[in-house]
Each structure stands twice: as structure tokens, then as C-alpha cells.
Amino acid sequence: MMCPLWRLLIFLGLLALPLAPHKQPWPGLAQAHRDNKSTLARIIAQGLIKHNAESRIQNIHFGDRLNASAQVAPGLVGWLISGRKHQQQQESSINITNIQLDCGGIQISFHKEWFSANISLEFDLELRPSFDNNIVKMCAHMSIVVEFWLEKDEFGRRDLVIGKCDAEPSSVHVAILTEAIPPKMNQFLYNLKENLQKVLPHMVESQVCPLIGEILGQLDVKLLKSLIEQEAAHEPTHHETSQPSACQAGESPS
């Protein structure tokens, strides 16, 4: 009785062997879907690099925009610039340096025929006050989110529509890195930090969002449709989470 049982087990084992290679394409398809997502992210990243997004951000000028902001306390920049009477002709400056555009971390989200791209960037700020010889170092972090989708026209053809592009409010952080701050500057720097958090997102959006619109406008609709079909077929459930950056973890002087 044992012999037929072993023969049956061996026979079933042999039947299972040809099935093994057929299981391989499924992980491959899942990987291809992830590759498609990263391909779309790479297209956006390469476009931002090609259009010198970092240089555009670095060339942002602050003085007029800070003073013109309705949220800025009256005379803030004027006080910053004048400081002392004998330095009235010397302007203070805020320069952007060390821009880190996280092209490798661009996240693409799908829902039916709707897409969302999340682009994280971080940079340093150097404040040179006219009333003080010390340079105050700060850093800023934010995530730009752009939405785009496929929409049918009156003839049933799909067109790419680009929606809102702005900084996610909860992602905007400005931190003061310099530790040796004179006590007389604490309140001023606190106000400046609050004002920068209000105006920086709009200033960065004005440089980055037009570039993203141009990049997305060149995408092939068939490619996007293919990505949507892949998403509908596999519906990945994992979500990547990023660790807080050094700037996000930074603290302002008390």
C-alpha cells in the first residue's frame, strides 16, 4: 500500500515542476510597474535638471517680496536694511545655497486617471544683516505637489490636464542653524523665520511649477494610460515613508 502512495506523491511533484517557471512573470510584472512609476519620476527629475531648476531657485531675490507681503510686519525689511544710521546705504541680503532637489525621491501616486507627483527640496539660507557682521545660517524644506490627470474631450480623445501645483503647507519648515545668536536678534530672527515660511513657498512655486507644467505637457498620453492600466491591474499597497531631514529636525533659537 505504501508503494502506490509514494508513486502518487512523486507524480504530483513532477506535475508541479513545469508550473514553477510560470510563477516568475508575476513578480516581474510587479517590478515593471514599480519601474514604470520610477520612469515617470525620472522624466520629471531629468526635466527639472535640464531646465536648471536649482539655478532658478538660487537666483530668487527676497527683499522686495518680503516687504510687499501683506503678512510681513511693516518696516521689517527697512529696519533690517537701515539698522544703524551709518549703514543705511548698505543692504542686507539673504542668499540661497546648497540646494538639494530630491530627484531620486520623487513620489508618484495614481488613482484611476489622476496622478500626483510629490517633489521634495531643501536648501540653506545665509542672512547677512546690515547692522551685524555675523552671518546667520538657516535652512528651508518643502514639498511641491503637482496634480495632473487624463480628461476626455468632446471627441472621446484623452488630453493631459495639469491641475494645481503648490507647496504642501505641512511640509514647509524654516529652521535657524546658527547657535551663537546675540539676544537682541532673537525676536527679529523669529519674525523673519515666520515671514519666510509664508513667502518662500510662493517664491519657489513661481520657479518650479512652470517647469513642471512644461515637462508634463510633453508627456505622451499613451504612456500615462499604460501606467494607469498597470496600476489598476496590480494595485500596490506599500507606501514609502521618508525620514525627517536635518532641516525639519532643526530648532530655532529660543
From Swiss-Prot:
Record GO cellular component, one term: extracellular region
Residues making up the signal peptide according to the UniProt record: 1-21
Keyword vocabulary terms for this entry: Disulfide bond, Glycoprotein, Secreted, Signal
Database matches in Pfam families: LBP_BPI_CETP
InterPro entries: Bactericidal_perm-incr_a/b_dom, Bpifa3, Lipid-bd_serum_glycop_N
Ranges of compositional bias, category Polar residues: 242-254
Top-level taxon of the source organism: Eukaryota
Glycan attachment positions: 36
Gene3D superfamilies from the UniProt entry: Bactericidal permeability-increasing protein, domain 1 (3.15.10.10)
Subcellular location: Secreted
Segments for region (Disordered): 233-254
Disulfide bridge partners, by residue number: 165-209
GO molecular function: lipid binding
Family the entry assigns: Belongs to the BPI/LBP/Plunc superfamily. Plunc family.
PANTHER family the record matches: BPI FOLD-CONTAINING FAMILY A MEMBER 3
Protein name: BPI fold-containing family A member 3
